[in-house]
Structures are given as C-alpha cells and as structure tokens.
C-alpha cells in the first residue's frame, strides 16, 4: 500500500470505528488478527479487531457523542502518525468515574504500523492526566492547592 492508502486506512479507523456515529464492524476490515494496541489507560494491550471494538465501545459508552478530529497525518514506509483531538460529553462511567456531564477535550497522537493492508500495531499517546482531571478523577493543580 502507498503512504496515502495507509493514511486513509487510519482515517477510517478514527471516523468509522472510534467516533460515535461509526460502525464497529469496520474494525474487522482495518485491524489484523494479530493487532496489538498500546494505550496509556489500559493496563493490558488491546488485541485483535475484537479488542479494538471493545476499546471503542468503552469510549462510546462513556462519551456517547465522542468525536475524533484528525489534525495532521504523516506517513513513511509502513508507519502512520496521526495527531488527533477527541471531544465528547461524559455521560457514562469511565474507569470507575460516574458520569459528570462534563465536556472533555483530549489531544493525542497515534503511531500505527501497517502490514498487508491492515493495522498490526498502534502506540497511543494522549494527555491521560488531563482527561482524568476533566472527569474529576484527579484534582487540577488549582483544586489541589485549595
């Protein structure tokens, strides 16, 4: 696949699997059976298309209106780097935190490796502390000083 085709594959992942209006079954077309996803909020790696679907379900359950916007993509060889912004309303439990109704915004980067037209590995990096602060699970510096 060309670098442009690799970038398009990752756009499909963001728009069709992880955004609220997407189709989870598209994960079967995008992720290889041996897919491994590394995420700072998951103590264990995500595995296979079913693991990607489960991760997407978790975010969709916590943020039914979740939206991911791709800000930039860079591709070289079998790698694609996608810089994204996620937003949504906290309406379901997230990592033991009850719904707050808070609007959240998270900036992140995903580095993906493509093989034979499918994603075989992802490394996600995002502001997990900022997300937990927006959900009220961790005090902000201002709250901690009060």
Question: Where do the model's predicted regions map?
Answer:
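C-terminal and inter-domain tail/linker signature
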Residues: 1-146
